[in-house]
Design a protein with these regions (language model features):
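N-terminal nicking endonuclease/strand-transfer module with a His-rich metal-binding environment
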Residues: 1-188, 193-587
Length: 587
């Protein structure tokens, strides 16, 4: 299929060198080049096949794939690996402690509880001590081991320990490692973290070949020992499913091996027989699917040209499919109905701000630590946004809260740093009757109304704004004028002050300390006791020994918990903090 979506056919005949005309598709350009190089069985006008054409001598040009490889009865295991450096130019990972914390999150175990790391001799490993031991290492290794039939295995922990012992034997050194098994995906898998030092304390260097092939082979041997060989009918069934899959498959790997550097593949049988008939049948079926996808084209009887961009396109399609499944599952679990046509997979270059309800967040790539968030946008679309790491969520609200994706970096930065900023910890429904100054109240009083869609979350916000205005009128904070509600002046300050006074009175009764508000220009000083999540935002409790104040919280304060802090109350409710020698403006 070409760029216009219409089917095309390669017609035998002489290639004409006319200039101008319509632009040719990538496949047609490759076919033209291949014909010149002799990779085509197309006949010339006289009916005789020119010598050299269709008789490729490339070693990988003919049916070079092996039935043994495709129909292997060994249990398959996917192993992904990454070397995470702790410093230097290649340092891109979140701290090991943060990575460990996320691996232990709730919802990844059999019962949905918080996971627990294990080690060689203990089912409850001290992962914090493991991170502490490795903080001065040059690097560590992250492995994801995913047996295809993990659900049938008796004990993934025992399997992991056997695999780690085999690694130690292969590498000739003891290993310091921790691991955790995850059951939150279609196929259970193990995260294995190995310190980057050997038993003598020297840097541990593992050959790329062992990481790429050796470890996987060892894992497959262990699974095959436990479960036995895979029945041929199961192998065949899996390959038949691969024929029509819109992702990178084992069949595509074999096609890549069999093709030459131009993408030409010859599937004409050298010696027809049962030995390769099944493999060839599957390959042809797969190539026909690639043709329908616009990624391959027939070049003659039993001959094909595969677009050089096919692998990347298939991998991108597979990734897109995984993202769509993640988004659909997230919206379904939260009880929201959003059509796939409204899904947007962001690339980090969105022209307009992404603001909306947080539907889900997690690890996009558990190996690299890349994170993602699913946002039900005020523009009526469902956004999937990727972040460099889970540290982008450090101060984000819980699922259901209101968020905004913020960009940090220059305007021409191709990969700006993205942070998920909280706009409200309170979900939309609760804001309608909440006591403080809500995110909805800010929408009611802003001079330039936020653009809101007529469907999806945008419409939900429209309805919630109307309901909030009606509630404020009932509370005496506005009056009706026909179909409109005229709100009182200083609405936000009034609502914020009411909530702080109510919370301050409650805390005063609990602590026995008097509550005192902070006036503009007033010096605020004392011990930072706790953070409070209120309708009006996040506030810090500052105890000066004689009483306490509730002032706007800001991220730099969190590291000062239990310590003495000081600052000056600014207009608009912010505090300009003096933390050591650095002054921070808390808004």
């Amino acid at each position: 299929m070409n760029d216009s979506g219409e089917d095309f056919r390669v017609r035998p005949g002489r290639i004409r060198g006319k200039s101008g005309g319509k632009p040719k598709s990538f496949i047609n350009q490759v076919l033209k080049a291949a014909k010149k190089a002799g990779h085509s069985s197309s006949h010339s006008g006289g009916g005789k096949r020119p010598s050299g054409l269709g008789r490729s001598t490339f070693g990988r040009g003919r049916i070079a794939f092996s039935r043994n490889r495709l129909f292997s009865s060994s249990r398959r295991v996917v192993v992904k690996a990454r070397i995470a450096r702790h410093q230097g130019r290649a340092f891109r990972s979140a701290p090991m402690s943060a990575h460990l914390s996320y691996l232990k999150r709730e919802g990844v175990t059999h019962d949905g509880e918080k996971a627990c790391m294990f080690e060689a001799r203990n089912d409850r490993a001290d992962d914090l001590a493991f991170a502490d031991r490795g903080q001065h290492d040059r690097h560590h290794f992250r492995f994801i081991v995913s047996p295809e039939d993990a659900g049938e295995m008796t004990d993934l922990k025992a399997f992991t320990r056997d695999l780690a012992r085999q690694m130690e034997a292969d590498l000739g050194t003891g290993l310091d490692w921790v691991a955790v098994d995850h059951w939150n995906t279609d196929n259970p898998h193990i995260h294995l973290l190995v310190r980057g030092v050997d038993q003598s304390g020297k840097d541990l260097v593992i050959s790329r070949d062992y990481i790429s092939h050796g470890l996987r082979s060892r894992a497959e041997e262990l699974v095959s020992i436990e479960l036995g060989h895979k029945p041929e009918r199961d192998v065949r069934s899996a390959l038949e499913r691969d024929v029509d899959a819109e992702r990178w498959t084992r069949l595509d790997v074999e096609i890549r091996i069999a093709a030459d550097e131009t993408g030409y593949i010859n599937l004409r049988p050298v010696s027809p027989g049962a030995g390769d008939a099944d493999s060839r049948h599957l390959m042809i079926g797969r190539l026909q699917k690639l043709e329908r996808m616009g990624l391959a084209a027939p070049a003659g009887p039993g001959e094909w040209m595969v677009g050089l961009e096919a692998e990347r396109s298939l991998r991108d399609l597979g990734l897109r499919g995984d993202i769509i499944k993640t988004m659909h599952r997230a919206f379904t679990e939260q009880g929201h109905d959003r059509g796939i046509g409204d899904y947007v997979i962001e690339t980090g270059t969105a022209a307009s701000p992404i603001i909306g309800r947080l539907v889900d967040k997690g690890l996009h790539d558990e190996l690299t630590g890349e994170a993602y968030a699913v946002i039900d946008g005020t523009d009526g679309r469902a956004h999937h946004v990727r972040f460099r790491g889970v540290d982008a969520f450090e101060h984000s609200p819980p699922v259901g809260g209101i968020v905004e994706v913020r960009h940090f970096g220059s305007t021409d930065d191709r990969q700006p740093t993205l942070v998920l900023a909280g706009r409200s910890d309170i979900d939309l429904a609760a804001q309608v009757t909440a006591p403080g100054a809500t995110w909805l109240d800010h929408r009611l009083v802003e001079r330039e109304p936020m653009p809101l869609s007529m469907g999806g979350f945008g419409q939900e916000v429209r309805d919630a704004i109307s309901a909030r205005a009606a509630h404020l009128a009932e509370e005496g904070l506005g009056r009706r004028q026909g179909q409109r509600v005229i709100l009182q002046r200083d609405l936000l300050d009034t609502l914020r002050r009411r909530e702080l006074d109510a919370v301050g009175t409650k805390l005063s009764a609990e602590t026995g300390l008097p509550y005192k508000g902070a006036a503009i220009g007033e010096h605020v000083a004392g011990t930072y006791r706790q953070r409070l999540t209120l309708t009006s935002g996040r506030f810090a409790m500052i105890d000066n020994g004689l009483g306490f104040q509730l002032v706007p919280w800001s991220p730099p304060l969190e590291k000062q918990l239990g310590r003495h802090v000081s600052g000056i109350a600014k207009g608009g409710g912010g505090i300009e903090w003096s933390l050591g020698r650095k002054r921070e403006l808390g808004l």
